[in-house]
């Protein structure tokens, strides 16, 4: 973790800005690690940080004939929960909705899979990558 300047320690907004910058840097690192990891496994990367409205898909890839929607979660070792545990039902719905938009916009006729790439980074920037294939499935909507 970066050293926090003395002035920022006494300035709540400055501290918040530094923490967000660290968080964003960690997220970018995680997405690059995930991309490299998937390419090494033979995936074809189609999109990175694809957005539709205010929803974003971290990585869209092809694994054979299957379209893979990948949510990348990167955390420092100090977090109490594993990164993949932070992909809740709301986030899953957003990803499903965005994936449907991507498939429709690109007129694709493919099976879609939702994966999570969870990355834990230690203080020396060493990392562990867990790839959870079929991490969740689209839910049927309830009609009344």
Can you annotate each of these PLM segments?
Residues 4-5:
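N-terminal basic, low-structured, amphipathic or hydrophobic segments
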Residues 38, 57-79, 83, 87, ...:
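Conserved catalytic cores of phosphodiester-cleaving nucleases, focusing on short active-site segments
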Residues 55, 66-68, 115, 130:
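Protein kinase-like catalytic core scaffold
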Residues 80-112:
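Mid-chain, well-packed structural core segment of small domains
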């Amino acid at each position: 973790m970066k050293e926090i300047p003395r002035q920022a320690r006494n300035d709540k907004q400055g501290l918040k800005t530094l923490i967000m910058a660290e968080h964003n840097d960690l997220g970018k690192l995680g997405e690059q690690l995930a991309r490299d990891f998937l390419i090494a496994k033979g995936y074809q990367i189609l999109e990175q940080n694809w957005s539709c409205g205010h929803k974003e898909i971290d990585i869209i890839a092809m694994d054979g004939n299957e379209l893979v929607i990948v949510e990348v979660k990167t955390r420092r070792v100090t977090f109490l929960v594993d990164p993949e545990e932070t992909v809740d039902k709301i986030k899953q719905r957003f990803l499903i909705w965005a994936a449907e938009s991507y498939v429709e916009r690109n007129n694709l006729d493919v099976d879609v899979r939702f994966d999570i790439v969870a990355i834990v980074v230690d203080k020396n920037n060493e990392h562990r990558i867990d790839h959870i294939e079929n991490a969740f499935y689209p839910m049927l909507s309830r009609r009344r």
